[in-house]
Amino acid sequence: MAPPSAVEANSPIDGVHLKSAFEVKAVHAQTASQGKTLAELAEKWDQGFTFAPIRESQVSRAMTRRYFKDLDTYAESDVVIVGAGSCGLSTAYMLGKARPDLKIAIIEASVSPGGGAWLGGQLFSAMVMRKPADAFLIDLGVPFEDEGDFVVVKHAALFTSTLLSKVLAFPNIKLFNATSVEDLITRQTADGNIRIAGVVTNWTLVTMHHDDQSCMDPNTINAPIVISTTGHDGPFGAFCVKRLVSMNQIKELGGMRGLDMNVAEDAIVKKTREIVPGLIVGGMELSEVDGANRMGPTFGAMALSGVKAAEEALKVFDERKAQNAY
């Protein structure tokens, strides 16, 4: 089979013109295997097997056109979720189910989303969730062992990979990983305070090298609602609430307290809320604001804080959207 010739820059991708994220339809799996099933391919690798021809520029254009189309589409988002750990992904899952009409962008600094939810405590495999967080697992379709007051997922990666795959399947959700939030977009309110109106982003590798390279300006995403779930204080953790302190919107961080599972999980879920207009905070980032206890290797509060964050966002969405017209 002859290799393909050069393809014009404005030619269709894979034979179809690129549409918006809401219009793209899934291509049937058999198209990629030239109409063959796996059973037909099995044990016939020496009988004329070959991949369909491709030119390298087609790969480049297939990636870049789609990515920059997404950047254009989500430059004006309805909700931005900062941090794709267990809380952020749970938030995205609930919002994607409840409001398929909303454009939801997830910004994750790491190449690999999921945060610390790929393993349980001390790098062990199993994930423990206290009831009633088993309701979230049932909704996801993740199997577990029932131990009475808590349940155990055999491997944390089973939970995280299932949640991630379901989130990414929503046509109205886009994950921008390897991308960090460097600042918050603000608007002054009538009372002289501020409202959060979006995020300032950059490639994570650029963010990490501002000190040793010349000025590398960022990009922006406008949104009436930002939900921050960046976790414990750290290089990228608790970023949004630390920025609120530096902007004098909150006096200081409360500082996360020691481990108390019984106190911590209830507090994180119940206090998930809008901290300042336009910014909802959930998960362990919230413990840094409130001076709450850490809960250690139990993940139910992360999932249910995400559920509550989605509820809080929808309560104020219409009001914040009306305010975010400028």
From Swiss-Prot:
A Gene Ontology biological process term: thiazole biosynthetic process
Gene Ontology MF: a single term: cysteine-dependent adenosine diphosphate thiazole synthase activity
PTM entry text: During the catalytic reaction, a sulfide is transferred from Cys-215 to a reaction intermediate, generating a dehydroalanine residue.
Domain of life according to the entry: Eukaryota
Keywords, comma-separated and alphabetical: Cytoplasm, Iron, Metal-binding, NAD, Nucleus, Thiamine biosynthesis, Transferase
Broad enzyme group: transferase
Modified residues (2,3-didehydroalanine (Cys)): C215
GO cellular component: cytosol; nucleus
Family as reported in the entry's similarity comment: Belongs to the THI4 family.
PANTHER family, A to Z: THIAMINE THIAZOLE SYNTHASE (PTHR43422:SF3)
Protein name: Thiamine thiazole synthase
